[in-house]
Curated annotation (Swiss-Prot):
Family label: Belongs to the bacterial CoaD family.
Binding site for substrate: 40, 72, 86
Protein name, UniProt field: Phosphopantetheine adenylyltransferase
Cofactor: Mg(2+)
Binding annotation for ATP: 16, 87-89, 97, 122-128
Superkingdom, taxonomy of origin: Bacteria
CDD domains, per the entry: PPAT (cd02163)
GO cellular component, one term: cytoplasm
Subunit structure, as described in the record: Homohexamer.
Any one GO BP annotation for this protein: coenzyme A biosynthetic process
Protein's job: Reversibly transfers an adenylyl group from ATP to 4'-phosphopantetheine, yielding dephospho-CoA (dPCoA) and pyrophosphate.
Protein location: Cytoplasm
Leading EC class: transferase
Lineage: Bacteria, Bacillati, Chloroflexota, Dehalococcoidia, Dehalococcoidales
Amino acid sequence: MIAIYPGRFDPVTLGHLSVARRASGFCDRLIIAVFDNPAKPGLFTAAERVDFIKQSIKDFPNVEVRSFSGLMVNFARKMGASLIIRGLRVGADFEREMEMYVMNRRLDEGIELCCLFSEPQYQYLSASLIKEIVILGGDSSGLISEHVAVALKNKLASV
């Protein structure tokens, strides 16, 4: 089975990587799909985000990383995927994922959704919160990979 784990990953967190690691255990191939939305650019380019994830998943043998734009179900179809993986942190995530599930099912009934609860230490972790912590001079260790932390500090210093 081929699964897609989509997201912005701006930047990728240890919570994201935890979901990817767990999902890779029950699918033959997992594609981490970095959403590239030109209308809403992030702090990092899609290419930078793909590179950060590639550096972080070297030990995940059945996981690959690609960027995509447009509808996620179209990308999933193109990749031959039948499952979308999403991580759930807090209650608001459930509501958003339910909305997306209903719309994705309307667009393609052949693609299922699997939501994985975040591990407790990552329940309130978000890319936005990471950026705020770093901007305010806080310690991001244990929240993002070291190579991502260095790139984030450098990027924020130049903004």
